[in-house]
UniProtKB/Swiss-Prot annotation:
Pfam families: IspD. Coiled coil: none annotated. The keyword Nucleotidyltransferase applies. Keywords: Isoprene biosynthesis, Nucleotidyltransferase, Transferase. NCBIfam families: ispD (TIGR00453). It comes from the Bacteria. It catalyses: 2-C-methyl-D-erythritol 4-phosphate + CTP + H(+) = 4-CDP-2-C-methyl-D-erythritol + diphosphate. InterPro entries: IspD, IspD/TarI, IspD/TarI_cytidylyltransf_bact, Nucleotide-diphossugar_trans. The record marks 174, 230 as: Positions MEP for the nucleophilic attack. This is 2-C-methyl-D-erythritol 4-phosphate cytidylyltransferase. GO terms for molecular function: 2-C-methyl-D-erythritol 4-phosphate cytidylyltransferase activity. One of its GO terms (biological process) is isopentenyl diphosphate biosynthetic process, methylerythritol 4-phosphate pathway. It comes from Shewanella oneidensis (strain ATCC 700550 / JCM 31522 / CIP 106686 / LMG 19005 / NCIMB 14063 / MR-1).
Length: 249
């Protein structure tokens, strides 16, 4: 499920940040140490087959082929027995690290291998339908949002808040609400600092943007494509297949 964010006014005070030049390297980080139990499969969901290769292979293809991404770092489970069988594992732009028990720990492990003067572009392993145009939009947004930004989608559906019985408690105003997507793009040293700080403080860190929010920084929101779905449930595989086939047509 995507995180839902509420947009803030651009006139609000921003915490001062140390900015990275746009010419800095862009390092893609893929946290892939999770199990993905909601798929009900016998293997991590990122290795489920999708149009002749795994979900993760499709995701890596999208990142490795982008000309502005200089390196891709994948955080793996210590007992991962599938990754090194992927053709992408031998790509010269790709590195691996051992991830942690939570997404944030895996991202931190990868950040430790990224240059300080770079931009970290963090993308879910199970989002195989990412388009190069969305990466381009996010990288271009560094001019407007030098503190970092994420791909997101405005909430279009009516939102309901439930009570403990699974009944509707209230209708939530959807004005300024966005679904958080990935990639999420931040200056590497800044993300490393605040991700570690948020974890040390016991803050709830569900994505990279939430660590920046914890530090008082308001990341930008960049409207992304609706087909950039996260494969979370079995039905999502059919939808991802449809989107990938349409992109190749």
């Amino acid at each position: 499920m995507d995180i839902v964010l509420e947009a803030t006014s651009q006139t609000e005070t921003q915490v001062a940040v140390q900015l990275e030049p746009l010419s800095s390297n862009v390092v893609a980080i893929v946290p892939a140490a999770g199990i993905g139990s909601r798929m009900g499969a016998g293997k991590p969901k990122q290795y489920l087959p999708l149009l002749g290769q795994s979900i993760l292979a499709h995701t890596l293809d999208k990142l490795l082929s982008h000309p502005l991404i200089s390196q891709v770092i994948v955080a793996l489970h210590p007992e991962d027995a599938d990754f090194y069988a992927l053709p992408q594992a031998k790509h010269p732009k790709l590195k691996t690290v051992i991830g942690g028990s939570e997404r944030a720990n895996s991202v931190l492990a990868a950040l430790d291998k990224a240059p300080d003067n770079s931009w970290a572009l963090v993308h879910d392993a199970a989002r195989p339908c990412l388009m190069a145009s969305d990466i381009d939009k996010l990288l271009t947004s560094r001019v407007q949002f030098p503190q970092g930004a994420i791909l997101a989608m405005p909430v279009r559906d009516t939102m309901k808040r439930a009570n403990s019985l699974g009944e509707i408690n209230s209708t939530v105003c959807r004005d300024n609400l966005w679904h958080a997507l990935t990639p999420q793009l931040f200056p590497t040293s800044l993300l490393r600092l605040h991700l570690q700080g948020a974890l040390n403080a016991g803050a709830v860190v569900t994505d990279e943007a939430s660590a920046m929010e914890w530090a008082g920084i308001s990341p930008g929101l960049v409207a992304g494509r609706a087909d950039n779905i996260k494969v979370t449930h079995p039905d999502d595989l059919e939808l991802a297949e449809l989107f990938l086939m349409r992109a190749k047509a």
